[in-house]
Structures are given as structure tokens and as C-alpha cells.
Amino acid sequence: MDELPVDLKAFLLNHPFLQLTDGKKIKCTLNGHEFPCNLQELEKFTQGKKYEKLRPAADFNYRQYEPHIVASTKQPNQLFCKLTLRHLNRQPHHVLRHIHGKRFKKALSKYEDCVQKGIEFIPARLMQKRPKDAREEVSRGRTSKQGNGTWAPSSSEEDGDSEDSMSDLYPSHLFTLKSPTEATTGGDGNQEEDDFHTDDGEDMEVDTPALQKRKKAQGGGTQKKFRNNHWKSGRKKRGSVK
């Protein structure tokens, strides 16, 4: 052991499953494989998936990641991450891969930010399952006015919408009602009604001659066409007689 380089000694101290044999080789006590005293080969082996799977879970300190990663209550053989709401296998390489991932780092930074501001932390996965309006209310730090999360207009808005009027678009005299006396007596209302009928009568007088002229024009055209046909047929007969 004293003959080994300093960097190789430090590496073996950090990996108790690698031991120096009498043949001056490095042996892995997990699978019995032997390696030469080469630091690069040992680093390559320890970074591989086989070594991570062989390492017993009992020697790994899972409590160092509490309270974010705890034992699952639904699945005793697995762990549960409170920040990402995901289950993890009780294996060191699974936990290490999760805590070094982008999802966990993003959730951890958000959790620390909420702790500093004094706001309750809500995981992103839980926010995605909530309705959109509920997420907005939670982000503002208040609860929704409606219990079922649906929007409903207030009474003042309903009253304002129901009082629609056209008086602001047209003159006011168009909306004045006639008095009972004007309706019974022959006042201005009868005169307007007479004028209305007079206008219709004049329209009828103008339209009637026009219809008669059209009829005359149509009748003259048929007579003229009949005369032309009669003249042609007579001319042909005269030519045949000759």
C-alpha cells in the first residue's frame, strides 16, 4: 500500500469496495474482478453502471437528502421525492441521477425561493393538474371567490347589462308615446295616417300607367312579329305561283 502513488491511495480510501491484493492488483469485493494498479481504469470502472448496481443500498446514506427525498408510504421498497412528486428506486445511482437532474434542481431552487419569501411551495406537477384560474389565484396568494372555480358575473354587472336602451342612439321624440286623446280624436295622427295613404295612392297611380305601357309595348311587338311572318309567307306563295 505504501508503494502506491498518492492519488491512487486517496482513490482507494474513497472506495472501500476496492482493495489491494497480495499480487499488487486491485480487487473489487462486490463482483471479484481484479484490475491493475491503474487509476484511469479504476475511475472508468467506478463510473460505470455495473459498479453502481453492485453497490449495496445499505451503505448509501439516503437520509442526507431528507426532507425532500423520503421513504414512500405507498411503496415501501421505493423512495418518494416531495419536490417533483416522483417515486425513485431505493438504489444509490437512481437517487444520484435524480438529484443531479434538471427537474430536481429547478424544483429545489423554487422551493428555496418560496422559503425566503414565506410562500407555500406547490410542486409544478401538482399545479399542472389544477384549473387555470385556480393556478392564477394560488400564484397571487389568495383563494378563488367561487367555490367551484368557475367564473360568474356579479349582480352589478348583470344589472348594468340588462338595462340596454336605444335612446342614446336615436332622437328622443321617436320614443314618445301618443296620448289617449290623440289616438281617439282625429288630430295629427289622422293627418299622418292620411298622408301615408295618400303617398301609397300616388305610388299606385304612377305604377298603373307604367304597367299599361308595358302591356302595350309587349302587345305591339307580337303584332309586328305576326305581320312580318304573314308578309313573308305571302311573298313565298306569290313566288311559287309564278
UniProtKB/Swiss-Prot annotation:
Biased composition (Basic and acidic residues): 130-140
Name of one Pfam family that matches: SURF2
UniProt region (Disordered), positions on chain: 126-242
Acidic residues bias: start-end ranges: 156-166, 190-206
Biased composition (Basic residues): 224-242
Top-rank taxon: Eukaryota
Bilayer-crossing regions: none
Compositionally biased residues, Polar residues: 144-153
InterPro entries: Surf2
Matches recorded under PANTHER family: SURFEIT LOCUS PROTEIN 2
Family from the record: Belongs to the SURF2 family.
Protein name (record): Surfeit locus protein 2
Organism this protein belongs to: Takifugu rubripes (Japanese pufferfish)
Gene: surf2
